[in-house]
A protein has these predicted regions:
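C-terminal helix-rich "cap/oligomerization" subdomain common to oxidoreductases
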Residues: 89-91, 316, 330-376
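Conserved SAM-binding strand-loop segment of SAM-dependent methyltransferases
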Residues: 72-80
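Glycine-rich phosphate/pyrophosphate-binding beta-alpha loops
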Residues: 200, 248-256
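N-terminal Rossmann-like dinucleotide-binding module
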Residues: 1-70
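Beta-strand-loop-alpha-helix segment that lines the small-molecule cofactor/substrate pocket
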Residues: 89-96, 100-147, 162
Length: 376
């Protein structure tokens, strides 16, 4: 059993507190406003025997009162967590600009760290933190929980199992219409903006899905409703094999494109939303004869004529089994030396550097070379 304390008990930290205290972990944030009460699924591990909530710490009196109402121990200051010998792990869920100092002080106090994303403000901060992790021998674990999103795992399975033939384009979009939350996320000094908020998730997952060098990146940042930080972006990436990817985040989209779109030489897959409705349309056989021209708008086309029903088949999206709490299980196993980290600081560093390359592209309006080929 590991004792875990949480610094930062706002929306994310409060959700973590409820989930850890209840034993449901990532599976169900029971009791969080807007979330349904529920039970662990058969594939989900109860983390109750693995992790115990030691307490929380927050500077907001309202959040302190909230924690006390739930019966959680409240530390008066972060230093009190550092000084508590019973605490094994500190979960950092404060605004982004505080992560570096909190992580460093935690590891130097003998604690392991589970850190909310983005783990740092930039790659230089993360390099410092990883150096301290190596120096102290403590685990620094980036909390990239969206690797366990069902939609991503379905997309990854389709990409890997050859259903679509050679996949040549992957697109993933996260879209809303409410702008950026009106808190620290809208402030540059606190690490706000959608690149750091959602870009870190989309890039993390894409780099897990496609184990290749990223050779080029081009990006546009949007400032539709905000001037200080980006409220969205559209990023184009090219991998060494020629595969391309488009990642897009929008906070002023009142109608949404599909969450995932994968195009391959033998088919196409669409995942509509987080409920994972969608389909796979796969080539059944090539037609020997040319298509008949169709009227499209003001002219005829053979190229864009739809295929006959006999040449393609439409399939449901594949099913995936996964443990929502694998991150917590792996965290404990990594601390105890039973397994390597699934989410590593080195991978987070690559993601951070790629985000910086994307921002540089947006600022210069130019393609940025990212990971050039090694000399022969």
């Amino acid at each position: 059993m590991k004792n875990i304390a949480i610094v930062g008990c706002g929306g994310m930290g409060g959700g973590h507190a409820v989930a850890i205290a209840s034993g449901t972990g990532n599976a169900i944030w029971a009791g969080v406003p807007g979330q349904k009460e529920g039970k662990l699924q058969p594939t989900d591990t109860d983390i109750g025997p693995l992790l115990s909530l030691a307490g929380v710490c927050d500077i907001d009196p309202a959040r302190v009162a909230w924690a006390r109402e739930r019966g959680y121990r409240v530390y008066d200051a972060y230093q009190d967590i550092l000084d508590d010998p019973a605490v094994d792990i500190i979960l950092i869920a404060t605004p982004n600009h505080l992560h570096k100092e909190e992580a460093i002080s935690a590891m130097r106090a003998g604690k392991h760290v589970l850190c909310e994303k983005p783990v740092m403000m930039d790659s230089h901060e993360l390099e410092e933190v990883l150096a301290v992790a190596a120096e102290t021998g403590k685990v620094f674990y980036p909390r990239q929980n969206r690797r366990w999103d069902k939609d991503f795992l379905i997309a990854k399975k389709i990409f890997e199992d050859g259903t679509l033939g050679r996949v040549f384009n992957i697109e993933c979009r996260v879209q809303g219409s409410r702008g950026i939350p009106g808190d620290w996320r809208a402030k540059k000094e606190f690490g706000g903006g959608m690149m750091l908020d959602w870009g870190v998730h989309l890039l993390d997952r894409l780099l897990v899905m496609v184990p290749e060098r990223v050779t080029r990146v081009f990006c546009d940042l949007t400032h539709v409703l905000t001037g200080e930080v980006d409220d969205g972006f559209k990023m184009h990436l090219t991998f060494e094999s020629g595969l391309t990817a488009v990642l897009e985040v929008g906070t002023c989209h009142f109608a949404a494109l599909p969450l995932w779109f994968l195009a391959g030489s033998q088919g196409t897959a669409v995942i509509d939303n987080w409920d994972c409705t969608g389909r796979v349309v796969r080539l059944h056989s090539w037609e020997d004869k040319d298509a008949k021209p169709i009227l499209a708008g003001a002219g005829l086309t053979k190229t864009m004529a739809p295929r006959g029903d006999s040449s393609v088949e439409t399939l449901p999206l594949p099913q995936v089994d996964f443990d929502n709490n694998e991150l917590y299980l792996n965290l404990v196993d990594a601390i105890d030396g039973r397994a390597p980290q699934i989410v590593t600081g080195e991978h987070a560093l690559r993601v951070m550097r790629l985000m910086e390359a994307a921002v540089s592209s947006a600022e210069t309006h130019a393609v940025v070379e990212f990971e050039p080929a090694l000399p022969v």
